[in-house]
Amino acid sequence: MKSILSSFIFLFFMAHALSAEIILQNPKVNEKAPLFSAVNSYGEKINLADFQGQPVILEWSNHECPYVARHYEEENMQSVQKMAQEEGFVWLTIISSTPGEQGHVNPSQANDLTHSRNAYPSHVLMDESGEIGMQYGAKTTPHMYMIDDKGLLRYKGAIDDIGMGMKFFSASFANATNYVATQLSDVKLNNKLAIDNTVA
């Protein structure tokens, strides 16, 4: 899982050192998810607050990360995206790679990735400054967050239990416990989650 924190932390502090309004956060589950706004890959401004009343999934992504690449090459991520949207979730894919760093894309390239991978995000958000990533403490890709219709963060962490290292590339997604896919209904129904926090 590719670390994204180091690639944008310097730019973030440089951009916001003089702003008293920016607060670095690492939200806890069952607390309010930090609000944010960003421009999507089509140039539209997207506000998390606009989705109040709908459950939301945040997916931090870097197409050059080998973990992300395998999830998409084997259509595991697309399968979960489709399941989530069928359950009424808004799926926001967030790209926090800074210019010149691994995984950085411009909006047109982001759209090309979505189409070439047959992905199902509701929006792809461009977070070049890393501000949203800092708000959520997103450190790896894929890093997943589930937010319920009341705006509470219900889950954060890995997408599944395969783990990191070489075992990831030999393990079967079919035999893994997918923390997002298996808990869609519970988040939607505001039920207590069996697992709400894992290491991404």
How should each PLM-predicted stretch be described?
Residues 2-11:
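Sec-dependent signal peptide recognition
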Residues 20-48:
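N-terminal "domain-start" segment that seeds a small globular fold
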Residues 48-69:
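Short active-site neighborhood of thiol/selenol oxidoreductases, capturing the structured segment around
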Residues 148-200:
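Thiol-/selenol-based redox modules, centered on thioredoxin-like
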Residues 13-20:
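Sec/Tat signal peptide C-region and signal peptidase I cleavage site
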Residues 69-117, 128-133:
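Structural microenvironment flanking redox-active thiols in thiol-disulfide oxidoreductases
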